[in-house]
């Protein structure tokens, strides 16, 4: 039910129509769900403005992790649209029902079937870097390369020299 990627190594599975509230309580708010194929989402959890500001402005994960918008049905236009929110309503967009490949339908309101992540490949790379650092009293080439692999996912290729290589090499 979640976006297909090779990052997830282990997760807790939930059934599509009767378990898991990830994407309902955590995720973008979705208003006007009776018209929307993705169903309802309350978006009860928010990221803070300082957390949003802690991301590099070029980090492509920022506006997914800290989504300063919700989805709302526009009766006048007849479609769902992205509506920017005030600073107190920065949703956790990573677990949005809007990322689902197959929408559950407008009547599904309290379950999403979005699996809960336990360990990602990026977690393994970061643990490798930390272990290398601790075992060898400082960063090793393997530790730097592991950290660079994680950071490469965050920035466009044209920014890698500065935002990935220069950043990691300066540590």
Regions found by a protein language model. Give the residues of each.
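Elongated scaffold/linker segments in the mid-to-C-terminal portions of large proteins
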Residues: 1-127, 132-134
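Structural helix-adjacent loops and short alpha-helical linkers that scaffold large soluble proteins
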Residues: 135-143
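Boundary/linker segments of alpha-helical solenoid repeat arrays
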Residues: 157-161
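Surface-exposed binding/hinge segments that line
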Residues: 170
């Amino acid at each position: 039910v979640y976006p297909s990627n090779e990052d997830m190594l282990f997760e807790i599975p939930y059934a599509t129509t009767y378990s898991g509230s990830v994407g309902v309580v955590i995720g973008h708010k979705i208003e006007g769900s009776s018209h929307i194929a993705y169903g309802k989402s309350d978006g009860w959890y928010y990221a803070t403005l300082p957390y949003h500001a802690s991301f590099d402005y070029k980090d492509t994960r920022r506006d997914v992790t800290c989504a300063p918008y919700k989805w709302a049905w526009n009766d006048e236009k007849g479609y769902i649209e992205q509506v920017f929110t005030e600073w107190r309503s920065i949703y956790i967009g990573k677990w949005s029902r809007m990322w689902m490949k197959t929408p559950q339908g407008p009547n599904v309101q309290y379950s999403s079937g979005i699996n809960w992540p336990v360990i990602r490949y990026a977690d393994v790379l970061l643990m490798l870097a930390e272990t290398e650092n601790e075992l060898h009293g400082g960063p090793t080439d393997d530790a730097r390369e592991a950290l660079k692999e994680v950071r490469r996912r965050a920035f466009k290729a044209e920014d890698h020299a500065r935002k990935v290589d220069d950043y990691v090499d300066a540590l």
